[in-house]
Amino acid sequence: MKIGMMVNGNIFSYDGESSQAFEDSRNAFMEAVTATQTTQDSGCSCTREVLKNRVDVSRTKRYINGCIDDIMQDIKDGVLTLNIGDVVPCELTDGQKVVFEVTDIDENGYRLEMKELLKTMAHTDMQKWYDTFYKSLLPTSLKNAIIPTKREYKKDGDGKLVEVYAMIFAPSASEVFSEEEFDDNDWLGDRGVYEQLDFYKDWRNRIRCTVEDGKPNAWWLLSAIAGHSTGFALVAYYGGCSYSSATATWRAAPVCFRIRKSK
């Protein structure tokens, strides 16, 4: 099965089996994307066009010498209001510096997603890692701001609707991909569970890099493949949709959560 992505009229693809072909295609893809971009965000070597009106909170005068504690306190007090596309810097407890992007806003909270990919793992290991990430890597001020989020998915991708509550979670396929992409890939699970987020309508916002080498990598989604319990959808390194066995260990775990807005 060949999968690929077009940039400026050029198609970059690989056969899904050859690791060297994957590496060559990934490098060529990044060179093409880099050539089309003019701005590089902090925190990751992935380049991406900065959306109009997007704000890097750390570069505003009030927070240049501040930290995540100041940002969380001002959000709580209503001094700071975030918009979709804004970026919030954070230093994890192990010293790693990451960036969280605002991908959605609702009545009660802001949805933040980590731009970087910290660790690759099997889909079956994600929940255990999420628990560790929440308990051990998040600064206290950020951890205290996170609110439980109801997540819904269809059993085996197209079966009974299941509800769970989570502090850290992975996006659903229906939040990332469009109806047209579901039409073209009938194996995608969780169709209709959510609407596609505006943030993900630009495929460049789906590209994420690993901390280890700064290169784009595939990342897991919550959704199982339609009709299956052991295969899961993912975002490929080029921003398109793909899938893999739940035991594959070279896909990364995304980090997504919601923080409370000021009352």
Segments predicted by a language model, with ranges:
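Short, low-complexity, charged amphipathic interaction modules
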Residues: M1-R48, N53
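Collagenous Gly-X-Y triple-helix signature in extracellular proteins
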Residues: G43-K263
